[in-house]
Protein backbone atom coordinates (compact mmCIF):
# COMPACT_ATOMS: atom_id res chain seq x y z
CA UNK A 1 0.00 0.00 0.00
CA UNK A 2 1.38 3.40 -1.01
CA UNK A 3 2.06 5.76 1.90
CA UNK A 4 0.43 9.20 2.15
CA UNK A 5 3.70 11.11 1.74
CA UNK A 6 4.55 9.15 -1.41
CA UNK A 7 1.04 9.70 -2.78
CA UNK A 8 1.29 13.48 -2.29
CA UNK A 9 4.81 13.66 -3.73
CA UNK A 10 3.78 11.71 -6.83
CA UNK A 11 0.86 14.11 -7.36
CA UNK A 12 2.69 17.34 -6.51
CA UNK A 13 2.22 18.70 -10.05
CA UNK A 14 -1.52 18.00 -9.91
CA UNK A 15 -1.80 19.60 -6.46
CA UNK A 16 0.13 22.66 -7.61
CA UNK A 17 -1.96 22.99 -10.77
CA UNK A 18 -5.17 22.77 -8.75
CA UNK A 19 -3.86 25.44 -6.40
CA UNK A 20 -2.97 27.72 -9.32
CA UNK A 21 -6.39 27.30 -10.89
CA UNK A 22 -8.18 28.13 -7.64
CA UNK A 23 -5.99 31.20 -7.07
CA UNK A 24 -6.50 32.53 -10.60
CA UNK A 25 -10.26 31.88 -10.48
CA UNK A 26 -10.37 33.95 -7.29
CA UNK A 27 -8.52 36.78 -9.02
CA UNK A 28 -5.43 36.14 -6.92
CA UNK A 29 -1.94 35.77 -8.40
CA UNK A 30 1.58 35.67 -7.15
CA UNK A 31 3.09 38.17 -9.54
CA UNK A 32 2.00 41.28 -11.40
CA UNK A 33 0.36 40.79 -14.80
CA UNK A 34 3.48 41.72 -16.77
CA UNK A 35 5.49 39.01 -15.00
CA UNK A 36 2.99 36.13 -15.03
CA UNK A 37 4.27 34.26 -18.07
CA UNK A 38 7.92 34.76 -17.21
CA UNK A 39 7.62 33.60 -13.60
CA UNK A 40 4.86 30.99 -13.77
CA UNK A 41 7.32 28.09 -13.93
CA UNK A 42 9.19 29.45 -10.92
CA UNK A 43 5.89 29.60 -9.07
CA UNK A 44 5.10 25.98 -9.95
CA UNK A 45 8.54 24.77 -8.93
CA UNK A 46 8.26 26.67 -5.66
CA UNK A 47 4.95 25.09 -4.68
CA UNK A 48 5.85 21.61 -5.88
CA UNK A 49 8.77 21.87 -3.47
CA UNK A 50 6.35 22.91 -0.73
CA UNK A 51 4.21 19.82 -1.38
CA UNK A 52 7.34 17.68 -1.03
CA UNK A 53 8.33 19.35 2.25
CA UNK A 54 4.84 18.97 3.73
CA UNK A 55 4.71 15.33 2.58
CA UNK A 56 7.99 14.63 4.38
CA UNK A 57 6.61 16.18 7.56
CA UNK A 58 3.63 13.81 7.43
CA UNK A 59 5.97 10.89 7.90
CA UNK A 60 7.35 12.65 10.98
CA UNK A 61 10.55 14.01 9.39
CA UNK A 62 11.97 17.25 10.81
CA UNK A 63 11.39 19.84 8.07
CA UNK A 64 11.62 23.01 10.14
CA UNK A 65 14.76 24.33 8.39
CA UNK A 66 13.42 23.51 4.92
CA UNK A 67 10.10 25.14 5.74
CA UNK A 68 11.80 28.28 7.05
CA UNK A 69 14.02 28.58 3.97
CA UNK A 70 11.01 28.16 1.72
CA UNK A 71 9.00 30.78 3.64
CA UNK A 72 11.84 33.32 3.63
CA UNK A 73 12.43 33.01 -0.11
CA UNK A 74 8.72 33.17 -0.85
CA UNK A 75 8.38 36.35 1.24
CA UNK A 76 11.27 38.01 -0.60
CA UNK A 77 9.86 37.08 -4.00
CA UNK A 78 6.38 38.33 -3.23
CA UNK A 79 7.59 41.54 -1.59
CA UNK A 80 9.74 42.34 -4.63
CA UNK A 81 6.78 41.73 -6.94
CA UNK A 82 4.44 43.75 -4.68
CA UNK A 83 2.01 40.96 -3.85
CA UNK A 84 0.23 41.98 -0.66
CA UNK A 85 0.37 40.06 2.61
CA UNK A 86 -3.42 39.65 2.47
CA UNK A 87 -3.23 38.01 -0.96
CA UNK A 88 -0.35 35.79 0.09
CA UNK A 89 -1.98 34.57 3.30
CA UNK A 90 -5.16 33.85 1.34
CA UNK A 91 -3.11 31.76 -1.11
CA UNK A 92 -1.48 29.84 1.74
CA UNK A 93 -4.90 29.04 3.17
CA UNK A 94 -6.04 27.89 -0.27
CA UNK A 95 -3.03 25.57 -0.34
CA UNK A 96 -4.00 24.32 3.13
CA UNK A 97 -7.54 23.45 2.00
CA UNK A 98 -6.35 21.71 -1.17
CA UNK A 99 -3.80 19.63 0.72
CA UNK A 100 -6.49 18.68 3.22
CA UNK A 101 -8.74 17.57 0.34
CA UNK A 102 -5.98 15.33 -1.02
CA UNK A 103 -5.35 13.83 2.42
CA UNK A 104 -9.08 13.22 2.86
CA UNK A 105 -9.42 11.57 -0.57
CA UNK A 106 -6.39 9.40 0.16
CA UNK A 107 -7.94 8.29 3.45
CA UNK A 108 -11.24 7.39 1.78
CA UNK A 109 -9.59 5.52 -1.10
CA UNK A 110 -7.12 3.64 1.09
CA UNK A 111 -7.61 -0.12 1.40
CA UNK A 112 -6.12 0.08 4.88
CA UNK A 113 -8.12 1.18 7.87
CA UNK A 114 -6.97 4.69 8.78
CA UNK A 115 -7.93 5.60 12.30
CA UNK A 116 -9.48 8.89 13.31
CA UNK A 117 -6.38 9.53 15.42
CA UNK A 118 -4.10 9.07 12.40
CA UNK A 119 -6.24 11.35 10.23
CA UNK A 120 -6.32 13.91 13.02
CA UNK A 121 -2.52 13.77 13.33
CA UNK A 122 -2.07 14.41 9.59
CA UNK A 123 -4.43 17.39 9.84
CA UNK A 124 -2.59 18.72 12.86
CA UNK A 125 0.81 18.50 11.12
CA UNK A 126 -0.56 20.17 7.97
CA UNK A 127 -2.08 23.05 9.96
CA UNK A 128 1.10 23.46 11.97
CA UNK A 129 3.17 23.67 8.77
CA UNK A 130 0.96 26.30 7.15
CA UNK A 131 0.75 28.32 10.37
CA UNK A 132 4.55 28.33 10.62
CA UNK A 133 4.84 29.39 6.98
CA UNK A 134 2.50 32.33 7.55
CA UNK A 135 4.36 33.40 10.70
CA UNK A 136 7.82 33.33 9.09
CA UNK A 137 6.50 34.79 5.83
CA UNK A 138 4.79 37.82 7.39
CA UNK A 139 7.83 38.70 9.51
CA UNK A 140 10.24 38.47 6.57
CA UNK A 141 7.83 40.30 4.26
CA UNK A 142 7.68 43.15 6.76
CA UNK A 143 11.48 43.31 6.97
CA UNK A 144 11.89 43.33 3.19
CA UNK A 145 9.25 46.00 2.62
CA UNK A 146 10.78 48.21 5.33
CA UNK A 147 14.16 47.95 3.60
CA UNK A 148 12.51 48.85 0.29
CA UNK A 149 10.67 51.82 1.81
CA UNK A 150 13.82 53.13 3.48
CA UNK A 151 15.76 52.81 0.23
CA UNK A 152 13.03 54.71 -1.63
CA UNK A 153 12.99 57.36 1.08
CA UNK A 154 16.75 57.76 0.80
CA UNK A 155 16.47 58.13 -2.96
CA UNK A 156 13.70 60.72 -2.67
CA UNK A 157 15.68 62.67 -0.09
CA UNK A 158 18.75 62.66 -2.30
CA UNK A 159 16.75 63.81 -5.30
CA UNK A 160 15.11 66.53 -3.21
CA UNK A 161 18.41 68.37 -2.79
CA UNK A 162 19.94 68.63 -6.27
CA UNK A 163 22.62 71.22 -6.86
CA UNK A 164 22.17 72.86 -10.25
CA UNK A 165 25.45 74.11 -11.76
CA UNK A 166 24.88 77.38 -13.64
CA UNK A 167 28.49 77.90 -14.68
CA UNK A 168 31.91 76.55 -13.79
CA UNK A 169 32.38 76.64 -10.05
CA UNK A 170 28.91 78.04 -9.25
CA UNK A 171 25.82 76.07 -8.24
CA UNK A 172 22.31 76.65 -6.91
CA UNK A 173 20.60 74.55 -4.25
CA UNK A 174 16.89 75.38 -3.93
CA UNK A 175 15.39 73.63 -0.91
CA UNK A 176 11.66 72.93 -1.17
CA UNK A 177 9.23 71.33 1.27
CA UNK A 178 9.35 70.36 4.92
CA UNK A 179 12.66 69.22 6.36
CA UNK A 180 12.78 66.64 9.14
CA UNK A 181 15.85 65.35 10.96
CA UNK A 182 16.43 62.48 8.54
CA UNK A 183 16.09 64.62 5.43
CA UNK A 184 18.31 67.31 6.92
CA UNK A 185 21.08 64.78 7.53
CA UNK A 186 20.71 63.40 4.00
CA UNK A 187 20.83 66.91 2.54
CA UNK A 188 24.07 67.66 4.37
CA UNK A 189 25.73 64.48 3.10
CA UNK A 190 24.40 64.92 -0.43
CA UNK A 191 25.40 68.59 -0.66
CA UNK A 192 28.99 67.92 0.37
CA UNK A 193 29.31 65.10 -2.17
CA UNK A 194 27.78 67.18 -4.96
CA UNK A 195 29.88 70.25 -4.17
CA UNK A 196 33.03 68.19 -4.28
CA UNK A 197 32.04 66.43 -7.51
CA UNK A 198 31.09 69.71 -9.22
CA UNK A 199 34.23 71.48 -7.92
CA UNK A 200 32.20 74.45 -6.73
CA UNK A 201 33.61 77.69 -5.41
CA UNK A 202 30.23 79.31 -4.76
CA UNK A 203 26.94 77.77 -3.62
CA UNK A 204 23.66 79.67 -3.60
CA UNK A 205 21.39 78.10 -0.98
CA UNK A 206 17.78 79.25 -1.37
CA UNK A 207 15.39 78.38 1.48
CA UNK A 208 12.36 80.40 0.37
CA UNK A 209 10.56 77.13 -0.46
CA UNK A 210 10.90 75.72 3.06
CA UNK A 211 7.58 76.42 4.85
CA UNK A 212 8.84 75.95 8.40
CA UNK A 213 12.35 76.56 9.66
CA UNK A 214 12.56 75.37 13.25
CA UNK A 215 15.53 74.99 15.54
CA UNK A 216 16.69 71.74 13.97
CA UNK A 217 16.45 73.04 10.38
CA UNK A 218 18.30 76.26 11.22
CA UNK A 219 21.05 74.26 12.90
CA UNK A 220 21.37 71.95 9.88
CA UNK A 221 21.61 74.95 7.53
CA UNK A 222 24.39 76.28 9.71
CA UNK A 223 26.15 72.90 9.47
CA UNK A 224 25.90 72.99 5.67
CA UNK A 225 27.49 76.44 5.60
CA UNK A 226 30.19 75.40 8.05
CA UNK A 227 30.98 72.21 6.17
CA UNK A 228 31.12 73.80 2.73
CA UNK A 229 33.44 76.46 4.13
CA UNK A 230 35.89 73.71 5.07
CA UNK A 231 35.82 72.66 1.40
CA UNK A 232 36.74 76.20 0.36
CA UNK A 233 33.24 77.00 -0.86
CA UNK A 234 31.51 80.30 -0.17
CA UNK A 235 27.80 79.78 0.55
CA UNK A 236 25.29 82.55 -0.02
CA UNK A 237 21.84 82.11 1.56
CA UNK A 238 18.71 83.62 0.05
CA UNK A 239 15.04 83.54 0.98
CA UNK A 240 15.45 84.20 4.70
CA UNK A 241 12.12 85.38 6.09
CA UNK A 242 11.69 87.36 9.35
CA UNK A 243 10.59 84.28 11.33
CA UNK A 244 13.67 82.40 10.13
CA UNK A 245 15.88 85.25 11.27
CA UNK A 246 14.22 85.11 14.70
CA UNK A 247 14.90 81.38 14.99
CA UNK A 248 18.57 81.93 14.14
CA UNK A 249 18.86 84.66 16.78
CA UNK A 250 17.18 82.49 19.44
CA UNK A 251 19.61 79.68 18.69
CA UNK A 252 22.55 81.98 19.07
CA UNK A 253 23.96 80.85 15.72
CA UNK A 254 26.58 83.22 14.35
CA UNK A 255 25.58 84.10 10.81
CA UNK A 256 27.58 87.34 10.83
CA UNK A 257 30.16 85.91 8.45
CA UNK A 258 27.54 84.37 6.17
CA UNK A 259 26.42 86.27 3.10
CA UNK A 260 22.64 86.52 2.87
CA UNK A 261 20.28 88.00 0.32
CA UNK A 262 16.55 88.62 0.32
CA UNK A 263 16.01 86.65 -2.87
CA UNK A 264 17.87 84.26 -5.14
CA UNK A 265 17.54 86.70 -8.04
CA UNK A 266 19.27 89.42 -6.04
CA UNK A 267 21.98 87.04 -4.87
CA UNK A 268 22.73 86.02 -8.45
CA UNK A 269 22.62 89.62 -9.67
CA UNK A 270 25.23 90.58 -7.09
CA UNK A 271 27.52 87.95 -8.62
CA UNK A 272 27.08 89.41 -12.08
CA UNK A 273 24.24 87.24 -13.35
CA UNK A 274 21.50 89.10 -15.17
CA UNK A 275 17.97 87.77 -14.67
CA UNK A 276 15.93 88.17 -17.84
CA UNK A 277 12.22 88.71 -17.37
CA UNK A 278 9.96 86.49 -19.49
Curated annotation (Swiss-Prot):
Disruption phenotype: Cells lacking this gene have no visible phenotype is response to salt, ethanol or energy stress. However cells with multiple disruption (RsbRA, RsbRB and RsbRD) have an increased basal level of sigma-B, indicating this protein is a negative regulator of sigma-B. Keywords: Phosphoprotein. The keyword Phosphoprotein applies. The keyword Transmembrane does not apply. Signal peptide: none annotated. The modification Phosphothreonine is found at residue 181. Residues 160-271 form the STAS domain. Probably present in the stressosome with RsbRA, RsbRB, RsbRC and RsbS. One of 4 functionally non-identical RsbR paralogs, it functions in the environmental signaling branch of the general stress response. This is RsbT co-antagonist protein RsbRD. It comes from Bacillus subtilis (strain 168). The gene is rsbRD.
Amino acid sequence: MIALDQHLTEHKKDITQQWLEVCTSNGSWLYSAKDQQKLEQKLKDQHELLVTIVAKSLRKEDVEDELNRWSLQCARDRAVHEVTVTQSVGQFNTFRHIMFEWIHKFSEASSQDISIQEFYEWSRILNQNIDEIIEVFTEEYHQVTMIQLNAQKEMINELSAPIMPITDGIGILPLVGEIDTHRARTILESVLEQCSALKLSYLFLDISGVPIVDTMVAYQIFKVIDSTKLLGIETIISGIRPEIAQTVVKLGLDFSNVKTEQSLAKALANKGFKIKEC
